[in-house]
Amino acid sequence: MVPVKKTFAQDLFDGIAPSYDTWAQVLTFFQYLRWRRFLVSQMALRPGNLVLDVCTGTAGVALEIAGHHDGRIVGLDASQLMLEAGLRAVEKKDLDGRVQLIQGRAERLPFPDETFDTVVFTYLLRYVRDPDATIRELSRVLKPGGELLSLEFGVPETLWVRALWEIYNRIVMPVMTIPVSRGWHRVGCFLGPSIRDFCQRCPVDRLAAIWLDNGIPPVATRPLLKGAAIVMWGTKRR
């Protein structure tokens, strides 16, 4: 793994790596796996395709892809401890010949231009300073005609759903994570404001414009759980 200078996101996720998959399920009302599966189901992969999974974390998306397609997957993440947990999961499924995990940042991908047939990223843009530049970098390593896909948290627009979302993120999640661990309580306090701020700065139409400006017109946007999560996917111009 290539060492990188520790960032806020790396420090945040290092603190929850051992129990990430379990509590990611609990805190999303057991939607975490369903969202991931829907994301992967939108991929139009062909035999032998090379996929880049950015913010791979514990390699959940990478393993989901490997379970449905015979291509090779490179997972990249800033957190070494998340990657170590992911590597154990990869080896447990005997997929280390097809899934490679490396440490790095989405803003400076260590790959040549037009390397990958598909690039997918999850919960990424809230942690980068310049979403536009990050999408440009992701597009750089994507082959013309290749797919870019993303999964991110959202803020529901329906008033009563938004009210429940606010109660959960402002009160319930910070309190329920206290007995779990210091790392998870930190996440419980951080996540709601982080999502709210990002959705104000980069609503879906703004994200679509960023994709378009970087040669990837989104062909679809799908809200999940009344807008608590959003999947986007599009194809890079040839």
Protein language model regions, located:
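Core SAM-dependent methyltransferase catalytic element
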Residues: N214-R238
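Conserved beta-strand signature within the Rossmann-like core of class I S-adenosyl-L-methionine
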Residues: G146-F153
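A short glycine-rich, Lys/Arg-flanked "PGG" loop and its adjoining helix->strand segment in the class I
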Residues: D132-P144
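Class I SAM-dependent methyltransferase SAM/SAH-binding core
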Residues: L50-R108
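Conserved class I S-adenosyl-L-methionine
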Residues: M1-A44, G60-E64, A85, G188-P193
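C-terminal alpha-helical "lid/dimerization" subdomain adjacent to the S-adenosyl-L-methionine
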Residues: T7, A78, V155-I210, N214, ...
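A short acidic, Gly/Pro-enriched loop at the edge of an enzyme's catalytic core
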Residues: E107-T118
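A short SAM/SAH-binding and catalytic strip from SAM-dependent methyltransferases
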Residues: T118-D130
